[in-house]
C-alpha cells in the first residue's frame, strides 16, 4: 500500500494518536513512495534513533536496577524510588518504543485489537510511574531537608517499598480507561481507500480529543510539576536560610552536610528537569492537535516537530542512568565495575555524599542572639553503613 498524502485523508490524523505520543503516521507527510530524501530520512534515520534509544536505555536501566539489588548498602529510600523509575522506563522501552518504530515499516496497525488495548495503557502506566515517582522523590527530599526531625526511622525501607508498589497500582488504574476506549478502526481516505489504525477515544465528536488531551496534560504533567515546584521552593528557602545561619566553629562539619543536602536535591531536580524537557513538547503538540481536530497541517515544519517531540519523549527513558552516572561518584564506580565485569568491591563509606535521604546526617540549626544549637541526627532505617551510600 503506497504512502498517503495528508490531503487525501477524510478523517483527522488525530484519530491515529495514542495518548501521549502522537500517532500521526509519518508516511502521511510523504509524497509517493519514490525514494525521496524525506522518505529515506524518516524510514531509516528515525528507526535507527529508536534502536539507539532502546539499546542505551536497556543497558543503563538494567545496570541501575542490578546495582541497587546486588549492593545492600545501596538499598535506601531514594534508591528504591530511582529503581522504580528504571522499572517504568524498561517497560516503555520493551513495549511502546518498538511498536512506535514499527509504524515506519507498516502502513497499518498490525498488533490487533488486544495490542490496541494494551499498548496505550502500558505507555500511560509507564509515564504515570515516572512522574508520580519523581513527585514522591521530591517529597522525600523535602522531608529530609526541611523537616529532618520528622523522618521515619523504623521500617522505612518497607514503607517506601509499599509506596513504590502503590505508585504502580495508581498508574495502572489511571490507565484503565485508555484500554477501555482504545479501539481498532478503519480510517477512510478521499481516494476511496482506507487503512487500519488504533485510536484512543470514540470517533463521535470533537469534544473527546480535547478532554483527553487536557486531562493527560493536567494529571501527567502540570499538577505533578506544580507540586514538585512547591517542594523545591521550600527546599531552596531552607538551604539558603541554613547557609546564612552556619556558625563559624562548625564550619567544616556543617559545610559538608550542606553540600550533601544540595547534592541530594540536585540529583532529583535533574531527573525532574529531564522529564520536563523531554515530555513538554509532546504535550504541547498533542494539545495543539486536539484543539485543531479538523485541520491538517502537511507542512515540513509540522512533520519535524512531530518527529522531534516523539524522539524526545522516548529519550527520557534512557537519560536517568546517565544523569546519575555524572552526578554520583558511588554509582559511577559500581557501574564501571559491572560494565567491565570486574569483581572489585568499593567501600561502602565513600568519600562522596550522595543519595541516601534515609541515611544522611541532617542538621537542624536553631539560632538565637547568643548561641547556635546544632543537633545532628542519623536518619537511618537500616544501618550506619548506608550513611553516605548512593
Swiss-Prot record:
**Which stretches are transmembrane?**
42-65, 80-99, 118-139, 157-177, 212-235, 267-287, 300-327
Entries under SUPFAM superfamilies matching the protein: Family A G protein-coupled receptor-like (SSF81321)
**Cytoplasmic face residues:** 66-79, 140-156, 236-266, 328-390
Q: What induces it?
A: Up-regulated in lung tissue in response to infection with influenza A virus.
Could you tell me which cysteines form disulfide bridges? 116-198
Name the Gene Ontology biological process terms.
antiviral innate immune response; negative regulation of interleukin-6 production; positive regulation of interferon-alpha production; positive regulation of osteoclast proliferation; positive regulation of respiratory gaseous exchange; sneeze reflex
Localization: Cell membrane
| Sugar-bearing residue positions | 8, 16, 192
Q: Which residues are in coiled coils? A: none
Lipid modification (S-palmitoyl cysteine), residues: 341
Q: Which GO terms describe its molecular function?
A: bombesin receptor activity
**What keywords are annotated for this sequence in UniProt?**
Cell membrane, Disulfide bond, G-protein coupled receptor, Glycoprotein, Lipoprotein, Membrane, Palmitate, Phosphoprotein, Receptor, Transducer, Transmembrane, Transmembrane helix
Q: Could you name the domain of life of the organism this protein comes from? A: Eukaryota
Membrane topology per the entry is:
Multi-pass membrane protein
| InterPro entries in the record | Bombsn_rcpt-like, GPCR_Rhodpsn, GPCR_Rhodpsn_7TM, NeuroB_rcpt
What's a single GO CC term here? plasma membrane
The UniProt family comment states: Belongs to the G-protein coupled receptor 1 family.
Please state what the protein is called.
Answer: Neuromedin-B receptor
